[in-house]
Every structure is written in structure tokens, then in C-alpha cells.
Regions:
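Short, well-ordered amphipathic alpha-helical segments that serve as non-catalytic structural scaffolds
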Residues: 1-6, 54, 139-154, 221-226
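Short, well-ordered, mixed-charge alpha-helical segments that flank or form enzyme active sites
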Residues: 24-25, 75-80, 125-129, 174, ...
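Short glycine/threonine-rich loop-to-helix capping motif typified by GTGT followed
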Residues: 28-31, 170-185, 250-257
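Active-site-proximal alpha-helical scaffold in enzymes
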Residues: 42-69, 108, 213-234
Length: 270
């Protein structure tokens, strides 16, 4: 991101970054040599939207002039930490998703024109009793539905007001669940919706089961495909909602429920 913006690291007032590893070790190892103030973020796969929402507030308030929001994930590390080491050779269920090895970062600064963080909704933690670490789409869909409904109610808008409604990594199972939950309340997003977990892989040629997941899934799709769509004039007003399954290696190993959360930011051209 800094290279694209032709900016040195010292131009940043703050780095907001997170990943899926214990103590966000990947993010702080990547940030430590920048010699820039750092705030670690953990929202599971919702981290990119969380960073954009928090970063937008910090820039708008004047607490930071320019900052970087980033998120990353790694397939093998996530499998070892939350499920089984690859050497174990466990069979993945059809509802399982493939953690993306990827990263994305955005630079936020107060400007008079360009792509802006217009609004944000911070999600609430939702627990509907799902405990299967191989079916996180089902665990996260209720949080996505709640956050989106809160946002639409607060802003008095409808799905038709937006060019796209992007979720982070609900995958195939979670996206269908989201449609069902919203349509019970009279909200239809099928025309506007897409999911980063369904976009990032070529699923006709790659066996990733229910799709992609991980902090890097939403971050890398947003910072590549979606930003390109903005630059090319294909979209001007979107909702980016990243969802996170709030589990730890301990809770996962004990078979505890998987609470979830979803944070939403409205990105638009101003």
C-alpha cells in the first residue's frame, strides 16, 4: 500500500493490523521494523472491517492524520491452530472453508475526494449455539444479518441503495443462511450480495469446499478487486461487512460454542 501511494513508512501516524495467530504475532512481526505506533486488532475474520471502522474514526477525529489498516491470514497456521495439523490428514467436511493465505492493507487519510469510509456499524456478539469449527459460515451468518439490519434501520436505507453488499467469508453455506435470515424480516439482498469467500477462489477448478475464509480473505479481495472496481467506475457506493468467528484454540478444542461478530463499513466515492 505504501509503495502504491509512494509514501515512506515514517509518513504513517499509526498501524492497525491483525491476523489469526495467537497474540497477532504475524502482524506485529510485520510492523515492528516500521518504527510506527502500532495497535493490534483481533476480530477474527472481521478484522479488516474493524480496522477500517476504527481507523476512520481516528482520522475523522484528528487523532491520526494518516494511518494504515491491515489484516492477514495463513492457511497452514490456521489449520494447525484451530483444527488439525496438515500431517494428520483429516478429511474436511463439505461445509468446511479454506483459510486464505493472503493480506490486504488500506491507507486512510482525510481528503476532499476519493473513496471514503462514509459510515460504520460495529457489530454485537451473537451466539446461536453452533460449535462445529468446520461450519463457520453457519456460525457467522446470524451476526451478519443482525449488523446489516441494524445498519439499514439506522440509516433508513435499503439494499437497492447500494451497488454491492460484500460479506467477508460466509462462504456458500453462510451466504445461503444469511439470505434466509434476512428474508424472514423482508430484506432481500440476492441481487446486490457477493461474498469474498466465494470470489477469491476459482471454485470450478479448485476444491475449496464451501469457499474461502480468514482475515486475509476479506482484506485481499477488498484491496484488489473491490478497489479496482471503484477506480474503474463499476461501483460508487458499497457495504463491506466482514464477519468473524470468535473462537480460540482452547475453546475449539473443548467443543465450546462459536460466538460470531460482523462489522460493517459503507465505502463510497465522495
Amino acid at each position: 500500500a505504501l509503495r502504491k501511494a509512494t509514501l515512506p513508512e515514517r509518513s504513517l501516524d499509526l498501524i492497525l493490523a491483525g491476523d489469526l495467530l495467537n497474540q497477532c504475532i504475524g502482524s506485529f512481526l510485520a510492523s515492528m521494523h516500521a518504527n510506527v505506533p502500532y495497535l493490534g486488532q483481533y476480530g477474527a475474520c472481521s478484522t479488516m472491517a474493524q480496522g477500517l471502522a476504527l481507523g476512520g474514526c481516528l482520522v475523522e477525529s484528528g487523532a491520526a492524520d494518516r494511518l494504515l489498516a491491515a489484516a492477514s491470514s495463513h492457511f497452514c497456521s490456521a489449520e494447525r491452530q484451530y483444527r488439525f495439523p496438515l500431517e494428520y490428514g483429516g478429511v474436511r467436511t463439505p461445509t468446511a472453508q479454506w483459510t486464505v493465505t493472503g493480506a490486504g492493507s488500506c491507507i486512510l487519510k482525510s481528503l476532499k475526494k476519493g473513496i471514503c469510509v462514509a459510515r460504520a456499524t460495529v457489530g454485537r456478539i451473537v451466539d446461536l449455539g453452533v460449535s462445529d469449527a468446520n461450519n463457520m459460515g453457519a456460525a457467522m451468518a446470524p451476526a451478519a444479518a443482525q449488523t446489516l439490519e441494524c445498519y439499514l434501520e439506522d440509516t433508513k436505507t435499503s439494499p437497492e441503495d447500494y451497488d454491492m453488499i460484500i460479506t467477508g467469508d460466509l462462504g456458500e453455506v453462510g451466504s445461503k443462511s444469511l439470505y434466509d435470515l434476512l428474508e424472514r424480516d423482508g430484506i432481500n439482498i440476492r441481487k446486490q450480495h457477493n461474498d469474498c469467500g466465494l470470489m477469491i477462489f476459482e471454485r470450478s477448478n479448485q476444491d475449496v469446499h464451501a469457499g474461502g475464509s480468514g482475515c486475509g480473505c476479506a482484506a485481499s479481495v477488498l484491496c484488489s478487486k473491490i478497489m479496482d472496481d471503484f477506480q474503474n467506475g463499476l461501483v460508487q457506493n458499497i457495504l463491506f461487512m466482514a464477519t468473524g468467528a470468535l473462537m480460540s484454540p482452547t475453546s475449539s478444542g473443548q467443543g465450546a460454542n462459536i460466538p460470531s461478530i460482523a462489522h460493517l463499513v459503507n465505502l463510497k466515492i465522495k
